[in-house]
Curated annotation (Swiss-Prot), chain B:
Pathway: Carbohydrate metabolism; tricarboxylic acid cycle; fumarate from succinate (eukaryal route): step 1/1. Keywords: Electron transport, FAD, Flavoprotein, Membrane, Mitochondrion, Mitochondrion inner membrane, Oxidoreductase, Transit peptide, Transport, Tricarboxylic acid cycle. This is Succinate dehydrogenase [ubiquinone] flavoprotein subunit, mitochondrial. SUPFAM superfamilies: FAD/NAD(P)-binding domain (SSF51905), Succinate dehydrogenase/fumarate reductase flavoprotein C-terminal domain (SSF46977), Succinate dehydrogenase/fumarate reductase flavoprotein, catalytic domain (SSF56425). GO terms for molecular function: electron transfer activity; flavin adenine dinucleotide binding; succinate dehydrogenase (quinone) activity. It holds the Pfam family FAD_binding_2. It comes from Danio rerio. Oxaloacetate binds at H293, R337, H404, R448, A451. Its cofactor is FAD. Component of complex II composed of four subunits: a flavoprotein (FP), an iron-sulfur protein (IP), and a cytochrome b composed of a large and a small subunit.
Length: 107, 661
């Protein structure tokens, strides 16, 4: 019976416990070294927002989009070849093989 | 609380039964799938083994593998009314087809005037006249219809301004039989044609009532009197054995890139179909033709585009020397792919490789201005950081020749039926079909053209379904099968599960991969290949001493990896022995000691006055390899190439000539 109880509590509490641990670890790691001693040490970097599941989804939409190296064409139409819905970025077959992000996909 | 207790009780009983009860009692536990609807005729039999529960299923057709070709065959059969099962070790959308992001060729004629006969010529020439012209005729003639059919299924091809499918120039395609300049035949879906193809086919297949058996590892074919009567498979989820009895079996299990140390294929490309056919005593065709790419990232296996060298990147050995200047003084790093691959391999063999094992070379890009690199090759710094862990503006990328595609496979005719060659004639094996990369129809011959393999998948997947619909009718009674059919496979499974030798599976696999990479890769000469054959024999024998650790039967990945290693071994020995025997250079099989093609006539000179060489003395023929699974000994036979197209008036066959681009 104790084995079963351990199993069921483990199964139920596992998900919530993992999130709990993650958030405490995050905040603990982010406190600067002299915090407990209460000295006048200034923070070298500003405190980051704890990445709780809710906080994670609050990231800016534009932030992730600008990191994409291959830009979308306006309306997905390639201005030179007038191809609709084609590959982004420069023409993939310009070197004789099918290139994307420096990788050769087909040759 | 009650629900939780009930759940934990079930959990508890499962835990207990796996540990304490003996194997025999597990036959009484609940099977993981509920038997309902058409699966109602699945019966548990104990004719095979009293240790392993074996479930028997009866279908009209079984398809092994659910990649592009497998899915097309499966729903083609369901559409024709057959009760079809699709047995796959991966979820359909995880098959390796999803990684094929290049385009698909078809002579639709949207960009300029085009004719499928010109596509036929290009493919025959690309295969170095080793492709069977009837199969190539079938594929290129069906290509436009196949692409339009895919588009009707919902595949979102990229479009021109007036709404037709946009085609671009790719893959050695020309107009007017090579005389009319570059042809634009390659259709694509943004950057992910293979991904989109697979998802389209999977979505379409759900309309029909194919029974999917996902995460079932096919062990062997059930052969009786030279006829294929089904497949025996291991359900990975609960460890039960299933026998799928069917009048028609279609093999679409993909290639075997994982026999080499560096390959672009997924870890699951282990040539299971080729091995199943070999164990059934049937031949595999042209396994020595393996397509390599010179610059694949060491360890990761993805390929770096030739554009890097085109923009000024150079290949460096351990001495910091730009070694391509020695091998190709004029073209240097821009020499053709096979020259570059061979030069890299020679440098590595002579000890000038880099890294702790000295088994690769460097591709240097940091001497180029970073803005130029980012402008001309956007995304390369990201690729290099993710896959090689290097900053491309400061360090070189480690590269080595990498396997990309296997042209060889299970020999079939143009209809997709598996054939054997006896007494000078092709004989069809009743009940067995093959398509996709696993099959060898042979459309790619000695070298595959870019964007032709996705076409191969859909055309021959459909061809298998059509042939079965032509020959067979749904609902036919199955011929009787011996009650102990599949016994040997289960015995082998049991042996591997309790294997207690001294070498682990991963060590033997690494030995095999390194041996194949250093002996059967791009650089092939007689001595190197012979040495490789001897080493592969000893690696094969070391399989007797294998050790596995997981003794369970539920989701035993150690066991499945060991079975996959057995399959890889059979493919590897056939590849290297066939390569050693073929004393010529043709397409992807290039030998240093026999640099020319050896055909029945010398096609570089006028044919008049030449004596035709007998079949035994020339090499324009298919290799058929058989293996004795006990000893690993390979026997080779040869089969002539089919030189006539399906309809000589409609499409004239192309007589052989010297291949030059």
């Amino acid at each position: 019976m104790s084995l079963l109880r351990v199993c069921c509590t483990a199964a139920r509490g596992f998900a919530s416990r993992r999130v709990f641990l993650e958030s405490t670890m995050n905040t603990a790691g982010l406190r600067p070294a002299g915090y407990a001693s209460g000295g006048v040490t200034k923070d070298k970097e500003p405190l980051k927002k704890a990445k709780t599941p809710q906080g994670r989804f609050d990231m800016e939409e534009t932030e992730s989009k600008s990191k994409d190296v291959l830009e979308r064409f306006p309306d997905d139409v390639n201005p030179e070849t007038k191809e609709k819905g084609g590959p982004r970025g420069p023409e993939p077959t310009r070197y004789g093989d099918w290139e994307r992000k420096g990788r050769c996909i087909d040759f | 609380m009650a629900a939780v207790c009930a759940a934990s009780r079930v959990l508890g009983t499962k835990i207990l039964s796996c540990k304490s009860l003996p194997a025999v009692c597990q036959a009484n536990r609940q099977l993981h799938f509920s038997i309902y609807g058409k699966r109602g005729d699945a019966k548990i039999s104990d004719g095979v083994s009293n240790q392993y529960p074996v479930v028997d299923h009866e279908f009209d057709a079984v398809v092994v593998g659910a990649g592009g070709a497998g899915l097309r065959a499966a729903f083609g059969l369901s559409e024709a009314g057959f009760n079809t099962a699709c047995v796959t070790k991966l979820f359909p959308t995880r098959s390796h087809t999803v990684a094929a992001q290049g385009g698909i060729n078809a002579a639709l004629g949207n960009m300029e005037q085009d004719d499928w006969r010109w596509h036929f010529y290009d493919t025959v020439k690309g295969s170095d006249w080793l492709g069977d012209q009837d199969a190539i005729h079938y594929m290129t003639e069906q290509a436009p219809a196949a692409v339009v059919e895919l588009e009707n299924f919902g595949m979102p091809f990229s479009r021109t301004d007036d709404g037709k499918i946009y085609q671009r120039a790719f893959g050695g395609q020309s107009l007017k039989f090579g005389k009319g300049g570059q042809a634009h035949r390659c259709c694509c879906v943004a950057d992910r044609t293979g991904h989109s193809l697979l998802h389209t086919l999977y979505g379409r297949s759900l309309r029909y009532d194919t029974s999917y058996f996902v995460e079932y590892f096919a062990l062997d074919l059930l052969m009786e009197d030279g006829e294929c009567k089904g497949v025996i498979a291991l359900c990975m989820e609960d460890g039960s054995i299933h026998r799928f009895r069917a009048k028609n079996t279609v093999i679409a299990t993909g290639g075997y890139g994982r026999t080499f140390f560096s390959c672009t294929s997924a870890h699951t490309s282990t040539g299971d179909g080729n091995a199943m056919v070999t164990r059934a005593g049937l031949p595999c065709q042209d396994l020595e033709f393996v397509q390599f790419h010179p610059t694949g990232i060491y360890g990761a296996g993805c390929l770096i585009t030739e554009g890097c060298r085109g923009e000024g990147g150079i290949l460096i050995n351990s001495e910091g020397e730009r070694f391509m200047e020695r091998y190709a003084p004029n073209a240097k790093d821009l020499a053709s792919r096979d020259v570059v691959s061979r030069s890299m391999t020679i440098e590595i063999r002579e000890g000038r490789g880099v890294g702790p094992d000295k088994d690769h070379v460097h591709l240097q890009l940091h001497h180029l201005p970073p803005q130029q690199l980012a402008a001309r090759l956007p995304g390369i710094s990201e690729t290099a950081m993710i896959f090689a862990g290097v900053d491309v503006t400061k360090e070189p990328i480690p590269v080595l020749p990498t396997v990309h595609y296997n042209m060889g496979g299970i020999p079939t005719n143009y209809k997709g039926q598996v054939i054997t060659y006896k007494d000078g004639q092709d004989h069809v094996v009743p009940g067995l079909y093959a398509c996709g990369e696993a099959g060898c129809a042979s459309v790619h011959g000695a070298n595959r053209l870019g964007a032709n393999s996705l076409l191969d998948l859909v055309v021959f997947g459909r061809a298998c379904a059509l042939t079965i619909a032509e020959i067979d009718t749904p609902g036919e009674k199955l011929s009787p099968l011996k009650p102990n059919a599949g016994e040997a496979s289960v015995a082998n499974l049991d042996k591997m599960r309790y294997a207690n030798g001294s070498t682990r599976t991963s060590e033997i696999r690494l030995n095999m991969q390194k041996t194949m990479q250093s002996h059967a890769a791009v650089f092939r000469t007689g001595d190197v290949l012979k040495e490789g054959c001897v080493k592969m024999e000893s690696v094969y024998k070391s399989m007797d001493d294998i050790k596995t650790f997981d003794r369970g039967i539920v989701w035993n990945t150690d066991l499945v990896e060991t079975l996959e290693l057995q399959n890889l071994m059979l493919n590897a020995v056939q590849t290297i022995v066939s390569a050693e025997a073929r004393k010529e250079s043709r397409g992807a099989h290039a030998r240093e000691d026999f640099k020319d093609r050896v055909d029945e006539y010398d096609y570089s000179k006028p044919l008049q006055g030449q004596v035709k060489k007998p079949f035994e003395q020339h090499w324009r023929k298919h290799t058929l390899s058989y293996v004795d699974p006990e000893t690993g000994k390979v026997t080779l036979e040869y089969r002539p190439v089919i030189d006539s197209s399906l309809d000589a008036e409609d499409c004239a066959a192309i007589p052989p000539a010297i291949r030059s681009y």
